[in-house]
A protein has these predicted regions:
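Extended, low-polarity segments enriched in aliphatic/aromatic residues
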Residues: 1-143
């Protein structure tokens, strides 16, 4: 499973060269880090109304779309995409410290994954968190 949030969506403005290997979390995380660090977002809004577990791309991998949908009914927003993605990961019961692009961006000063330094307004993570299932259970052990 991939944690696909505000940082990675900001990086998908163009097609990546086919010769770049993004088949595992580490190389994909490095690509997302490099792309995002060129021009970080000023503000990010994440549509979390309908989530999809068993990713990435569960629909194209032949799994059951109907059973993989996660009706979250959330909108996440903030001035720092790393913080927004950290909250997204926690909502999915994933450890943001194990998401490669988040740890790389945090190390380079683009944001924090330390939840004690992130202000959440509205519903709290504990009120809305649901375990997402997927292949990378080390990142999302709640699955």
């Amino acid at each position: 499973m991939a944690v696909d949030g505000g940082v990675s969506q900001d990086c998908s403005r163009g097609q990546t060269p086919a010769y770049i290997d993004h088949t595992n979390a580490e190389t994909l995380g490095q690509f997302i880090h490099d792309s995002y660090s060129i021009r970080p977002a000023d503000f990010v809004v994440m549509d979390g109304l309908q989530g999809l577990q068993n990713g990435p791309a569960s629909v194209w991998a032949g799994t059951n779309y109907a059973s993989d949908k996660m009706n979250m009914r959330l909108i996440l927003a903030g001035k720092n995409a790393v913080a927004v993605d950290t909250i997204e990961a926690l909502v999915m019961k994933c450890d943001p410290k194990l998401v490669p692009h988040l740890t790389k961006l945090e190390a380079d000063g683009f944001g924090t994954t330390d939840v004690s330094k992130i202000t959440v307004v509205g519903k709290q993570v504990s009120d809305v968190a649901k375990p997402f299932v997927g292949k990378q259970t080390a990142i999302c052990p709640g699955s």
